[in-house]
């Protein structure tokens, strides 16, 4: 700390001391009625407030002293988030080219999309034991190596089996990174920057998704090898992360846990610059000693977490947040944004891909807003507001599809199916009914913006660009005759509603429900349970990710498009109640202080918010709790 900053700190502390001394002089004499009780309350309150103000003053002057080293560690760590976003987002555009070149059926398309997600879920569940044994740094090095190898395999793949192998390897890498990166960032960050730096990981995830959408659009014009560039480019950030982590240290908390105290102290000092580390070091060491005593009981860590009420509640909150993040439809929006836009009436594939990049850009920009808000608003309020807006946006999106369905063109021409050909499609009466059947397409003409001579006929299994028979059988011929063919969308004047709904959804989702489940999970577990807790919550995230992404098209088929989005809106509304009742505020608290937030019953812990103007404080003195009541606090005044 500079000499000027040190002088400012000392001046501030002297002023605080003088202020607290003046406050004590105004208290009643011990012999006065209620004097002893009031004096004790006043001294307790003064001590609490003085200590808090002192810490606040030191944080204020130390804030600018945080070494650039900490920011570099957070940035290289967050490249794992970039890979997460890129590899999960790029496949939607690549699939448009792959399915034609390799003649992929529906099953193989689903395998390639969900293979990486499923592998990531397995890796995340096993990742707790992995980074607990190897360390956070080694786990991230392994993740970046897997992503590099997997991306190279994908770029060079000659068949669909090799593609699947590459996707599985990439999935293992991003699964390990998804639950290790937030923990590493949280453990190397100072308390006043922890929430913001952890949120940077989600910023990089959304940045990766946006970059993937731009890459998809740029290489969509290369029909033959464009997908190789799309899938192979992920190797570049993976190599950068691997090289960067060769020069970054291990988490000091993990080192202390493993008994490497001198190395941990040296790294902690390096990460805090000129700030004193004695208090933080002692706090970490004491918490580890207490947690080792608690963890000395036999049995798996997950069993001990479930048998100990505070960690059981923390695990329920952490896993619940990850579950509702997925059930509110985020990866339906991100994986299928181009498909959703096409469903709404956007005819051209390339236009749908470029419009999808708008949603990815919105996600990226408003994640930046979340980075700014997280330490100002707090985790609880930001998450609650985000889910409330998400619920409204999903409802608007559903209403847009409902409006389009109500004006869906009628089938006015029913051609006779050739002998031996499927005639099921000709039985549908409206375009939206026709589109819900993946084997059917809509053939029509336009007269003065009105749809005429429309029919529902089977799609050509070799190419979805034309029908199996009838007027739209030959793409070159029917286009010359001014006949139009629609597959997976209906002509409608309300196609713009989907883009508006998607953008509005991400405006609300990105600042809160995007980063907060990861931020909260990096904070709420004691050290002995942190790896396992984050592994379980990340695994839940990936499991529901697989569930939602694999069922969206079938859900839309059985419930209609608007029914699917009404369903997601219902899930988001239930998540809103969950956050209101169960999520406590962790803003500004040390990792060692957060465990006590879950001493309350689950249905009330979310309401125990000290920032709401209450005067209740708990003072830990030699293992005892002294409670300063509202009445005592009023006596202080």
From Swiss-Prot:
Record localization: Cell membrane
Superkingdom of the source species: Eukaryota
Pfam families xrefs: Sugar_tr
Segments for region (Disordered): 16-38
Coiled-coil segments: none
Entry-linked PROSITE patterns: MFS, SUGAR_TRANSPORT_1, SUGAR_TRANSPORT_2
Membrane topology, Cytoplasmic segments: 1-65, 136-137, 189-201, 250-313, 374-382, 519-538, 584-637
MF terms in GO: ATPase binding; myo-inositol transmembrane transporter activity; myo-inositol:proton symporter activity; protease binding
Membrane protein topology class: Multi-pass membrane protein
Spans through the membrane: 66-86, 115-135, 138-158, 168-188, 202-222, 229-249, 314-334, 353-373, 383-403, 498-518, 539-559, 563-583
Any GO BP: transmembrane transport
Glycosylation sites: 422, 447, 474
The keyword Nucleotidyltransferase belongs to this UniProt entry's keyword annotation: no
CC terms in the record's Gene Ontology section: apical plasma membrane; astrocyte end-foot; cell body; cell periphery; cell projection; cytoplasm; growth cone; intracellular membrane-bounded organelle
Residues bearing PTM Phosphoserine: 6, 44, 47, 629, 634
Function: H(+)-myo-inositol cotransporter. Can also transport related stereoisomers.
Name this protein carries in UniProt: Proton myo-inositol cotransporter
Taxonomic lineage from the root: Eukaryota, Metazoa, Chordata, Craniata, Vertebrata
């Amino acid at each position: 700390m500079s000499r000027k900053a040190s002088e400012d700190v000392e001046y501030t502390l002297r002023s605080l001391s003088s202020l607290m001394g003046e406050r004590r002089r105004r208290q009643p004499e011990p012999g006065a009625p209620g004097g002893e009780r009031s004096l004790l309350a006043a001294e307790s309150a003064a001590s609490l407030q003085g200590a808090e103000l002192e810490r606040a003053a030191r944080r204020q002057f130390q804030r600018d002293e945080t070494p650039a080293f900490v920011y570099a560690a957070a940035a290289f760590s967050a490249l794992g988030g970039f890979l997460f976003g890129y590899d999960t987002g790029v496949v939607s555009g690549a699939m448009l080219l792959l399915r034609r070149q390799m003649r992929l059926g529906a099953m193989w398309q689903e395998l390639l999309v969900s293979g990486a997600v499923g592998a990531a879920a397995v890796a995340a569940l096993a990742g707790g034991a992995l980074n607990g044994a190897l360390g956070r740094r080694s786990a991230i090095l392994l993740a970046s190596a897997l992503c590099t190898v997997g991306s190279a395999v994908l770029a060079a793949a000659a068949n669909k089996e090799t593609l699947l192998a590459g996707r599985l390897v990439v999935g293992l890498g991003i699964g390990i990174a998804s639950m290790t990166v937030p923990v590493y960032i949280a453990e190397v960050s100072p308390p006043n920057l922890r929430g913001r730096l952890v949120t940077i990981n989600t910023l990089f995830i959304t940045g990766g998704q946006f970059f993937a959408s731009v890459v998809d659009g740029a290489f969509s014009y290369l029909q033959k090898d464009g997908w190789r560039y799309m899938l192979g480019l992920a190797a570049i950030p993976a190599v950068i992360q691997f090289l960067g982590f060769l020069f970054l240290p291990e988490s000091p908390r993990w080192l202390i846990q493993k008994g490497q105290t001198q190395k941990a102290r040296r790294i902690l000092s390096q990460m805090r610059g000129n700030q004193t580390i004695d208090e933080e070091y002692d706090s970490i060491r004491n918490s580890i000693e207490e947690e080792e005593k608690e963890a000395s009981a036999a049995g798996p860590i997950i069993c001990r977490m479930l048998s100990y009420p505070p960690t059981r509640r923390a695990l329920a909150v952490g896993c619940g947040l990850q579950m509702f993040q997925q059930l509110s439809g985020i990866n339906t929006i991100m994986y299928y944004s181009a498909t959703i836009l096409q469903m709404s009436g956007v005819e051209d594939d390339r236009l749908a891909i470029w419009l999808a990049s708008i949603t990815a850009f919105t996600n990226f920009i408003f994640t930046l807003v979340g980075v700014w808000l997280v330490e100002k608003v707090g985790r609880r309020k930001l998450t609650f507001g985000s889910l409330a807006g998400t619920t409204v946006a999903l409802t608007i999106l559903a209403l847009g599809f409902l409006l389009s369905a109500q004006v869906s063109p009628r089938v006015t021409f029913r051609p006779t199916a050739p002998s031996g050909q499927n005639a099921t499609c000709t039985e549908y009466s409206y375009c939206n009914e026709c589109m819900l059947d993946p084997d059917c397409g809509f053939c029509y003409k336009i007269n003065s913006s009105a749809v005429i001579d429309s029919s529902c006929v089977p799609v050509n299994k070799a190419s979805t660009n034309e029908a199996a028979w009838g007027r739209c059988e030959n793409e070159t011929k029917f286009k010359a005759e001014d006949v139009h063919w629609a597959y997976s969308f209906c002509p409608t004047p309300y196609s713009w509603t989907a883009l508006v709904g998607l953008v509005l959804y991400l405006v609300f989702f990105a600042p809160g429900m995007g980063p907060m489940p990861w931020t909260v999970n990096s904070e709420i577990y004691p050290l002995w349970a942190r790896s396992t807790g984050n592994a379980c919550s990340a695994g839940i995230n990936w499991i529901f990710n697989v569930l939602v992404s694999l069922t969206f098209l079938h859900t839309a088929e059985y419930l209609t498009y608007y029914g699917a989005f009404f369903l997601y809106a219902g899930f988001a509304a239930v998540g809103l109640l969950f956050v209101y009742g169960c999520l406590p505020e962790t803003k500004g608290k040390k990792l060692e202080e957060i465990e006590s937030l879950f001493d309350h019953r689950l249905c009330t812990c979310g309401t125990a918010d000290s920032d709401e103007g209450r005067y209740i404080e708990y003072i830990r003195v030699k293992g005892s709790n002294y409670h300063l009541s509202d009445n005592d606090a009023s006596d202080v005044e």
